[in-house]
Every structure is written in C-alpha cells, then in structure tokens.
Design a protein with these regions (language model features):
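Hydrophobic residues within alpha-helices
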Residues: 21-22, 41, 110, 155, ...
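NAD(P)+-binding Rossmann beta1-loop-alpha1 motif at the extreme N-terminus of oxidoreductases
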Residues: 1-60, 64-67, 94, 298
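Helical "substrate-binding/catalytic lid" subdomain
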Residues: 151, 171-294
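Rossmann-fold dinucleotide-binding core
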Residues: 101-181
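Rossmann-fold NAD(P) dinucleotide-binding segment
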Residues: 56-119
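Hydrophobic beta-strand scaffold residues
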Residues: 32, 52, 121-122, 163, ...
C-alpha cells in the first residue's frame, strides 16, 4: 500500500463533490490543506485533520494540489487569479490535478499557466457524486504527462475504484463531456419510459425493478431508482450544472462537426426544467417535467428500494 503521507496535498474547492473527495483523502491518511471561497464549507474538514488555507496561493508549497470547482472561469481564477495558486513567482506545486468538468480550451489555458510556472497538470474529471465517493465507487479519467500521472496515481486511486489514463493534453475533458451528455440523454429516456409505463398502469417501482434486472439495467439506473420511485429530488447534481455540461458537449460537437440532435433536444428540456423552478433540485426531476407534459400526477410510492451502491 502506498504511503499517502509521502507528499503534502492541497485541495481547492469544497462543494458537494470537493468536500467528499477531500474527506476521503484525509480518512485514507493523506496530509491535506484545503481552501474554499466560502470558508465555512471547508471548516468541517478540520476535525478530520485538514489545515485551512486563506487563499489558493497559500497552497503553492504543497506537492500536489487538487482542484474541484464549478466551471471554467472558476478554475482559471483559482489557478491564475490575483490570489491564485500560481500567483507568487517562484512558488508552485509539483503537480496540479483538476477534477472539474470544464471546457478543453479553459483546461489548456490552465495547463499553459501551470507549465510556465514549472508545474505539471493533470486533467482528472470524475464520474459520480458525493454519495458515490462515500461508497468508494468514484471513477476518474485522466490525461496529461504520463510521468506526473504515475507519481500521482496512489492519491488518484485512493479517491475511488477506477482510474483510466487516456493520454496527453486535454483528452480526458472530452471523455467527461461525453459522459455527462450520456447522463442527460439516458436520464431523459428513463423518465419518458417510466412515465409511459406508469400512465399505462404499471407502478414505478415494479417497472424499474424489471429494468434493473434486465440487460438494460445499469449501475446508473439502479442508483436513480429511489429518486424515481419515491420522488426524492435532493440534489446530487443540479439541472443548472447539467445544462452547463450539455452546452459544453454541443460546443464540442460544433467544433468537430458532429450532429447531436438528441443532445440538443435534451438540452432544451433541461432548460425547461430550470424554467419551471427546478434549480436547486436533482436533475432526476426530469421525471416530474415529463409527467407534467403527459398530464400524469406523480405521487411518492413510499417503497423501500436500494440504490445499488452498497452490497
């Protein structure tokens, strides 16, 4: 087992995902100092052993620094802004690892700034949410310097159960964008067929039980079953964030001349979801929008169903 105390770790961004990932590193024994724009969101990590930093720049002396922020502008601010990680001449971590879902262009800009400061950068976006992190089921896709990847691998592996290296540069960014496009399209499709089955008389829990046991069942369909059955839309990933990722996918499609009509349609449905007030809920609320369009009144079924994360 690798010694996770070999390098000092910095962590920038303790939202839902960043908090859970930093907490996992701490529980695995890593030495972690954390920064978050809203300090109160980072403070609960202190009892786990985290040091609290007052700015990203204060983490420049760490060996490896992870970032997990909401978007492209946020990453560039915490990396290259006035108090950014690389704002002090001659001070930079050895490796910067960004786990956010951002554009390839912003990632390349951050990578260039890191290289100018003598810092290697890995793009390492993730598949999962805070609950998945807690269950140890997070997956990461990584691109960048192979040497930096090999050095950082013990810390990457400690975050979850799967790490995939796909090559140099920003290749992992397009992989993650495609992943989240798939997430949106699959969720909309699952919402449509669930509403169809229920309106025809099949209880949601019975329909999804069959789907999950069939060849079409998946980790994801099982994970979203409790939300669909009992209408618990507590946010794991919001419609606003999904809209951002669908926009990234459509921008990449235009760049590479790839038609994506399903993605374009789902993007507008997510926009409608937001317009109907589903802003701080889970994106599984696409089910509610579909039911409304079908004039189906949804009610919680109050059936105990598993999410497949724990066996």
């Amino acid at each position: 087992m690798a010694d996770l105390r070999k390098h000092k770790i910095g962590w920038i961004g303790t939202g839902r995902m960043g908090f859970s990932m930093a907490a996992r590193l701490l529980k695995k024994g890593a030495q972690v100092a954390v920064y978050n724009r809203t300090r109160a969101k980072a403070e609960p990590l202190a009892p786990l052993g985290a040091q609290l930093a007052d700015s990203p720049a204060a983490l420049a002396d760490r060996d490896i620094v992870f970032t997990m922020v909401a978007g492209s502008g946020d990453l560039l601010e915490v990396v290259s802004g006035p108090k950014g990680l690389l704002s002090r001449a001659g001070r930079a971590p050895k490796i910067l690892i960004d786990c956010s879902t951002i554009s390839q262009e912003a990632s390349a800009e951050a990578r260039g700034a890191a290289a100018a400061a003598g810092c290697a950068m890995l793009a390492a976006p993730v598949s999962g949410n805070a609950k998945v992190v807690k269950a140890g089921r997070l997956s990461l896709v990584v691109s960048g310097s192979k040497d930096a990847y090999d050095e950082a691998l013990p810390w990457l592996e400690s975050l979850g159960e799967g790490v995939s290296y796909v090559g140099e540069g920003e290749l992992s960014r397009i992989v993650k964008i495609c992943h989240n496009v798939f997430l949106g399209v699959v969720t909309q499709s699952l919402a449509e067929i669930t509403v169809l089955a229920e309106k025809a008389g099949v209880p949601r829990h019975a329909f999804l039980d069959f789907i999950n046991k069939s060849v079409m069942g998946s980790t994801f369909s099982r994970y979203k079953t409790p939300a669909f059955v009992n209408l618990d839309f507590a946010p794991t990933f919001t419609p606003v964030l999904l809209r951002k990722d669908l926009d990234l996918g459509l921008a990449a499609a235009r760049k590479h001349e790839v038609p994506m009509p399903l993605t374009a349609a789902v993007r507008e449905l997510v926009q409608a979801l937001i317009g109907n007030g589903y802003v701080d809920t889970d994106f599984a609320a696409l089910l509610a929008l579909e039911a409304k369009a079908a004039r189906l009144e949804l009610k919680p079924e109050n059936v105990a169903v598993g999410d497949g994360l724990y066996t």
